Curated annotation (Swiss-Prot):
Region forming the signal peptide: none
EC number: 6.2.1.54
GO cellular component annotations of the record: cytoplasm
Gene: dltA
InterPro entries tied to this protein: AA_adenyl_dom, AMP-bd_C, AMP-bd_C_sf, AMP-binding_CS, AMP-dep_synth/lig_dom, ANL_N_sf, DltA, DltA-like
SUPFAM superfamilies: Acetyl-CoA synthetase-like
MF annotations from Gene Ontology: ATP binding; D-alanine [D-alanyl carrier protein] ligase activity
PROSITE patterns the record matches: AMP_BINDING (PS00455)
Short name of any one Pfam family annotated for the protein: AMP-binding_C
Key words of the record: ATP-binding, Cytoplasm, Ligase, Nucleotide-binding
CDD domains, per database record: DltA
Full protein name: D-alanine--D-alanyl carrier protein ligase
Pathway note: Cell wall biogenesis; lipoteichoic acid biosynthesis
Similarity comment: family membership: Belongs to the ATP-dependent AMP-binding enzyme family. DltA subfamily.
């Protein structure tokens, strides 16, 4: 068990100073370098005399300087707000207006001119590193202090800043490095794929730094080159893969993504969106000896609140895979619309309690009051997810409350429709979306479909293909759930975080 994240990093700087903490295509930085650089940057930040404990926005990609700056800010007592280089200027501006950071550190060129907030460039960070200033930690982030603030997309389009404290982070990290499901080895070799602005990134950097391992990052230029990306990943000595299931589906389009080409890769950690039976089955085919860990949890509960190892038996027997056993320190409950706790097997809203629950949204008391509350004397959060608990305390996922629609008199869960379509042997990926009329009532249900290789060639017309797909799933799907129209695509759009961008597809069919 670790008691302080920075203490852990400092310990490895002493015991394994020359061991790589960060590797980007063979160019690496060591734990000793990380300590020296973060000390120097922390001293530089202190010299700016910022308001104590004020948040600092850090703009950039998955570079070493981003990591060193995060560690430095923690040492100097400031929460960091990671903003990815691919963020739209409008979103960056919205984050700044909400967070009111005391400083902006631009590891990459900053796309906006902001009045009233000082901006530190990469050249200034480099100069600070060269100064090699010693640093004594007297006011570092601890306890209930904010460690990082990650902005998620709000339902109104206005981003919300989730405040994660040092205590929140320790709750998650200690669970992950000690829980048998994750089976994290000492000195883990982890692929650093999700951007730092996505809290799934915490699932790779937190256990890696806590256990003295190495992060294998990819330059942003490579990430944009799909073919070269997965050819390169296959050459990396990573043992643990952390991503959304959608990113793994993309990886499996490359023949190099298999156990024969990547023998060191033994663990897959998934979070951020639902892991489907189809994706898990394909992974077992590609990596017969690998462990697949399905984790679940919102950003507001610090990355994940439950996890479970997915077995072949689960793949064969479940239509929707279980999302795990709740963390021991984070009791998870199912409640009805009146807030009453439901019994095992009953479906309702998933709520999480305990020390990993965020204190709320930064500078947004109204939204905080809506989502955060107290349950059985513990801080609690409304996930907005539908689920149930088995008698063995395994959490089952039933979709999003806000993805439920009323159609033809029936209440339909969109994710359930997508799941059923994904069961077709002809379908690689499917997403169900509603089309609304002028009264904003559901007019009909459509589905975006990506078929497996070679499927289209077997049919002369799309109509015949559609009939075949419908026939392949009709025995498991209620007729009122069947989409009236299939829209075929070569790929589905992804968000910057690697999730299928359902909102974009809904807007597309409704001409928004």
């Amino acid at each position: 068990m670790i008691k302080d994240m920075i203490d852990s990093i400092e310990q490895f700087a002493q015991t394994q100073a020359d061991f790589p903490v960060y590797d980007c295509l063979g160019e690496h930085r060591t734990y000793g370098q990380l300590k020296r650089d973060s000390d120097s940057i922390a001293a530089f930040i202190d010299s700016l005399a910022l308001l104590a404990k004020s948040p600092v926005l850090v703009f950039g990609a998955q570079t070493y300087d981003m990591l060193a700056t995060f560690v430095a800010l923690t040492k100097s007592g400031h929460a960091y707000i990671p903003v990815d280089v691919h963020s739209a200027p409008e979103r960056i501006l919205a984050i700044i207006e909400i967070a009111k950071p005391s400083l902006i550190i631009a590891i990459e060129e900053f796309p906006l001119t902001i009045e009233g907030i000082s901006l530190v460039s990469l050249s200034e960070i480099e100069s600070a590193k060269l100064a090699e200033m010693p640093y004594e930690r007297t006011h570092s982030v601890k306890g209930d202090d904010n460690y990082y603030i990650i902005f998620t997309s709000g339902t109104t389009g206005q981003p919300k800043g989730v405040q994660i404290s040092h205590d929140n982070l320790l709750s998650f990290t200690n669970w992950m490095i000690e829980d048998a499901a994750f089976d994290v080895p000492k000195q883990p070799q982890m692929l650093a794929q999700p951007p730092y602005s996505f809290d799934l990134s915490v699932m790779y950097w937190a256990p890696t730094l806590a256990l003295g391992g190495t992060l294998f990052a990819l330059p942003k230029e490579l990430v944009a080159d799909f073919k070269q990306l997965f050819t390169t990943i296959a050459q990396l000595p990573v043992g643990i893969w952390t991503s959304t299931p959608s990113f793994a589906d993309m990886a499996m389009l490359s023949d190099d993504f298999c156990q024969a080409k990547m023998p060191a890769l033994t663990h897959f950690y998934f979070d951020g969106e639902e892991l489907t039976v189809s994706t898990a089955r394909k992974l077992f085919e590609r990596f017969p000896s690998a462990k697949i860990i399905n984790a679940y949890g919102p950003t507001e509960a610090t990355v994940a609140l439950s996890a479970i190892e997915i077995t072949r038996e689960m793949v064969d027997n479940y239509t929707r895979l279980p999302i795990g056993y709740p963390k021991p320190d984070s009791p998870t409950y199912i409640i009805d619309e009146d807030g009453k706790e439901l019994a095992s097997g009953e479906q309702g809203e998933i709520i999480v309690t305990g020390p990993a629950v965020s204190k709320g949204y930064l500078n947004n008391p109204e939204k905080t009051a809506e989502a955060f509350f107290t349950f059985k004397g513990q801080p609690a959060y409304h996930t907005g997810d539908i689920g149930s608990l088995t008698e063995d305390n395994i959490l089952l996922y039933g979709g999003r409350l806000d993805f439920q629609i009323k159609y033809a008199g029936y209440r339909i869960e969109l994710e359930d429709v997508s799941q059923q379509l994904n069961q077709s042997p002809m379908v690689a990926s499917a997403v169900a979306v509603p089309r609304y009329n002028k009264e904003h009532k559901v007019q009909n249900l459509l589905a975006y479909i990506v078929v497996k290789d070679g499927v289209k060639e077997r049919f002369d017309r799309e109509l015949e293909l559609t009939k075949a797909i419908k026939a392949s799933v009709k025995d498991h799907m209620m007729s009122y759930m069947m989409p009236s129209k299939f829209l075929y695509r070569d790929s589905l759009p992804l968000t910057p975080n690697g999730k299928i961008d359902i909102k974009t597809l809904i807007n597309e069919v409704n001409n928004r």
